[in-house]
Amino acid sequence: MNAVLSNHPVISARGLRKAYKNKLALDNTDFEIGPGKIIGLIGPNGAGKTTALKAVLGLIPFEGELEVLGRDPRTQRDDLMNDVCFIADVAVLPRWIRVSEAIEFVAGVHPRFDRAKCERFIANTQLKPKMRVREMSKGMIVQLHLALVMAIDAKLLVLAEPTLGLDILMRKQFYETLLNEYFDEQRTILVTTHQ
């Protein structure tokens, strides 16, 4: 059974440990995150935030116990990613792609993508279907990423430095949109930031 029940944690880590050569990034780390929470991992460079995210997403090997939405990200990553969305701090869209093509692509690869919902989000921005990424400001690119992600019915949204490089007004708009249009008691948001 893969459904996350309201009394079960979305993420549960016990003794999470990861070393890179001689550098210990995570040292016997324990944490638990329940459904319907917004959690921020805040700290300086080298604190282990990105390493923890990579473990949660099943992108790196690690020691210890880690369960995400009732699954082991090391062995059940493909299944897990049906219920997880991720925006990386270095998330890049091809500069040649148009808004409509980005929507088409995500619709083709993610079974829980709602095209109509994405188009509604985009209608509230300055983005136009024929606009190419190379014609967009950084803030507009973030709006496109956000529209694509918010249109996926995911239980866990993982954001790594999602507002990096944005001015204070765009940051505020980003988080307001996320809270008002996406977040609810069934969804969990995990954010890392230095800010």
Regions found by a protein language model. Name each.
Residues I11, L26-N28, M81:
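Conserved structural motif at the start of ABC-family nucleotide-binding domains
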Residues K23-L24, D78:
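Short coil-to-beta microelement around the adenine-binding A-loop and adjacent beta1/P-loop entry
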Residues G58, F62-T75, D79-L80:
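Conserved ABC transporter NBD signature motif
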Residues A88-H145:
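ABC-family P-loop ATPase nucleotide-binding domains
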